[in-house]
Amino acid sequence: MKKNIIITLLAAATLTSCGEYNKLLKSTDYEYKYEAAKNYFAKGQYNRSATLLNELITILKGTDKAEESLYMLGMSYYNQKDYQTAAQTFITYFNTYPRGTFTELARFHAGKALFLDTPEPRLDQSSTYQAIQQLQMFMEYFPNSTKKQEAQDMIFALQDKLVLKELYSARLYYNLGNYLGNNYESCVITAQNALKDYPYTDYREELSILVLRARHEMAIYSVEDKK
């Protein structure tokens, strides 16, 4: 115990010097490195904590420090806004430690990291589906979590992003009209599918109006074709 306290104090002192940090990187005293990584993490120096922990997770595997080091590595990436790497680290954590100390938080932050990394609605939404999946899994595993409502709110926001992408597509089809085909029909199909998949969306009214307008245009052209 006394030895651990001394190592922790020495690690904390090391943080004051950039030169000492470079020496620390070359050190083979892994317990010392681990305590230094924890101190860097506590001080918000996440780049340094991630660098050290990335080396240590393999070395510490099978020890009582392995679990905490992997979770801390994920949070170090998360706090640097490297959300993809953070999510993968959290996923590795809860797959390795399904009943671990930080499993609830790891599952939550895996979903939230992917949520924060999703693109704007006009772009490919593969990562949005992945974020929804992770957040839904979090809620299934931890239905009584204090973070359940936040997870649910993120899912609703992600679903709205998917609806918005469909709304943009439906608008485009409507504006194209009969150019190179019956785009009004494509507008109706796209809008109706969005309404079917997400019946409680905030964009329900706009999608419904697009369906009515597109059908109206289809009816007009149908009458003209029969003349």
What is the predicted function of each stretch?
Residues 2-6, 17-227:
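Acidic, polar-rich low-complexity tracts and alpha-helical solenoid repeat scaffolds
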